[in-house]
Amino acid sequence: MGCGMSTEDKEGKARNEEIENQLKRDKMMQRNEIKMLLLGAGESGKSTILKQMKLIHEGGYSRDERESFKEIIYSNTVQSMRVILEAMESLELPLEDARNEYHVQTVFMQPAQIEGDSLPSEVGNAIAALWQDAGVQECFKRSREYQLNDSAKYYFDSIERIAQSDYLPTDQDVLRSRVKTTGITETTFIIGDLTYRMFDVGGQRSERKKWIHCFENVTTILFLVAISEYDQLLFEDETVNRMQEALTLFDSICNSRWFVKTSIILFLNKIDRFKEKLPVSPMKNYFPDYEGGADYAAACDYILNRFVSLNQAEQKQIYTHFTCATDTTQIRFVMAAVNDIIIQENLRLCGLI
């Protein structure tokens, strides 16, 4: 009797293989929903990434949605100038032109939240005049010594446009607007065959205890670090360096028992501000073991190695990207690369590669 496989056996084997492949495909379908957790210290750029996803994958902002950002942008702009003027008092920096004192009073008279369809003309004029004052400029250069919104310069430079009665926020205006995230916000979008549910959680220390609710079945963690903050102190604790806080937080996330099998993507963000700062604020002043001077590539390598070296699990790969979260073209490219990483991870976890 021959030892070859019978037709019936061959058909049975083929059926088994088809069933196994179908099970793998079903498993893959279950994994087509990607739960992505956005983590990072306060003001690292998490909310900006969410806004970019809306611009890139959801057709952007409607006119009504843009209108809704006006009051936030007005408030950000006025509040930023107020912060500088208060810092001038504590740093004992005088105005160059004493006539601008009138404009200082105009800014201080404004409420914390600016309401209305347009910025009052006297407020726009006050900010424009003060931004030209050499004393204000000197204080701005020392902004690492106090807590100033990243978008301050952008809005001050655009004040003439923002103060127009028919002003409508642009994509860039919206991206740079800042509202502190409290609680958990979710954004859903589709890239190819994958549905992403992206969760943004508050980055300030007081918000971190709420993260635990997001941890179950997380596919990927997108961890953001504002590398431009190497010379700044925490908003919540002005004895702690912001970069050191980010390193401590990344260590706890990367090596957490919750995330043993979770892929981690690290965005080293705000490279534009980082590049501007390096020549004027030596990194060695804050990280004494750094030897690269003002060299941008050397500084990037140093920071990258500081974060990646915290990973204690040999089998866990950290995927890294240097980013500028307000640059839509770059974020579109980077998120396409992230999508490819997640597809490969899915195939591997489902046993298809």
From Swiss-Prot:
Segments of this protein annotated with the region G4 motif: 265-272
Molecular function via GO: G protein-coupled receptor binding; G-protein beta/gamma-subunit complex binding; GTP binding; GTPase activity; guanyl nucleotide binding; metal ion binding
Gene: fadA
Keywords: GTP-binding, Hydrolase, Lipoprotein, Magnesium, Metal-binding, Myristate, Nucleotide-binding, Palmitate, Transducer
A single GO cellular-component term on record: heterotrimeric G-protein complex
Chain segments carrying region G1 motif: 35-48
Compositionally biased region (Basic and acidic residues): 7-25
Family: Belongs to the G-alpha family. G(q) subfamily.
Region feature (Disordered): 1-25
Region listing for G2 motif, in residue ranges: 173-181
Keyword Metal-binding applies: yes
UniProt-annotated binding residues for Mg(2+): S47, T181
UniProt KW GTP-binding keyword: yes
Annotated stretches, region: G5 motif: 323-328
Consequence the record notes for mutating G42R: Loss of intrinsic GTPase activity leading to constitutive signaling
Lipid addition sites, N-myristoyl glycine: G2
Domain G-alpha: 32-353
Transmembrane segments: none
Reported cofactor(s): Mg(2+)
Subunit note: G proteins are composed of 3 units; alpha, beta and gamma. The alpha chain contains the guanine nucleotide binding site.
Function: Guanine nucleotide-binding proteins (G proteins) are involved as modulators or transducers in various transmembrane signaling systems.
Gene Ontology biological process terms, A to Z: conidium formation; G protein-coupled receptor signaling pathway; penicillin biosynthetic process; pheromone-dependent signal transduction involved in conjugation with cellular fusion; positive regulation of penicillin biosynthetic process; regulation of conidium formation; regulation of secondary metabolite biosynthetic process; regulation of sterigmatocystin biosynthetic process
Protein name from the UniProt record: Guanine nucleotide-binding protein subunit alpha
Lipidation (S-palmitoyl cysteine): C3
InterPro entries: Fungi_Gprotein_alpha, Gprotein_alpha_su, GproteinA_insert, P-loop_NTPase
Spans annotated as G3 motif: 196-205
Organism (species): Emericella nidulans (strain FGSC A4 / ATCC 38163 / CBS 112.46 / NRRL 194 / M139)
Binding site for GTP: E43, S44, G45, K46, S47, T48, D150, L175, T181, G203, N269, K270, D272, A325
